[in-house]
Amino acid sequence: MTLRQLCGSPKRLLLLLLTLVPLLTSCDPKEPTNELLNKRHDNPSYVIFTLKEAKLNDPTRWDAEPTLADITLTGREEKMTLSLTSKGFLASEEQGVSHFSVKSTDTESDVVYLLEIDYLDARRELMNGQFIENGQDRIHQHFFERFTREFIRGKWRTYAVKEPEELGYDYRYVDVTPWNQPYNAPESKFTGTSNPMGFKGLIRFTRADWKFLLTIMLMHAHQPKIYNGQAMPFYNNLYYPIDQESDISLNVAFVVDAGTTDLTGREESSSN
């Protein structure tokens, strides 16, 4: 028996088809969210870097997953505030420094710095939680990279420094969960190794008497950032083949000791 014979007339057949259309369309699978169009977080309008000088209570702890419990703050700190403008994020000296002045481990072997990163929206309200809560911590991670320039075949070319011993600095993630609680709160758990974020981290400078640009990049991955059970190192966001983009990428100037050797790349750029 045909569908037309069952319905009895073309008019009844048309009514039946109109009734079935909503049922069929309701069974379609839900389209996946396009993270390129819907990041599930706002874009920051302000970035605040706070650098706090500290001492390692036991220098041997540096290679054994140090936490905030392993340092003692000296009370010296610098703050850099960058505001989003038509020319990108620019540092305001009225609201902080334009570069960070630090000491190398050659000058003081136990010196280390706590680097804290805060993002604010257009209303100047803290929005760090948007990159962490509701599973966003699984796809976000800060990286702290350095790039070098070489004059090859008549052109200046830029390369990422991929060997950690050539960086001139070293970094450790010291994030805690919950992210908005003190590290020594009863509910706080150290997650700097298992789930590196970089909103809080320890950095020290192993090369003496130089200045450079530290590229601080917040990765937004389109898949879990932990690859085969491993997190990517702080100095290379391309260490594993993870589909990603950057939410933020900023060059921050550091002057180590007297800053005699200039590795910012600005001299090469001006001579080109």
Protein language model regions, located:
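Extended, polar beta-sheet/loop recognition surfaces of beta-rich domains
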Residues: 31-32, 125-183
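N-terminal onset of structured domains
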Residues: 34-42, 77-146, 243-245, 250
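Post-signal-peptide N-terminal segment of Sec-exported extracytoplasmic proteins
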Residues: 50-89
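Sec-dependent bacterial lipoprotein signal peptides
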Residues: 1-25
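A beta-strand/beta-hairpin structural motif
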Residues: 82-102, 158-202
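Exposed beta-sheet edge/beta-hairpin loop segments within beta-rich domains
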Residues: 38, 99-113, 179-243
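Bacterial Sec-dependent N-terminal signal peptides
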Residues: 21-49, 55
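Short beta-strand elements
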Residues: 229-272
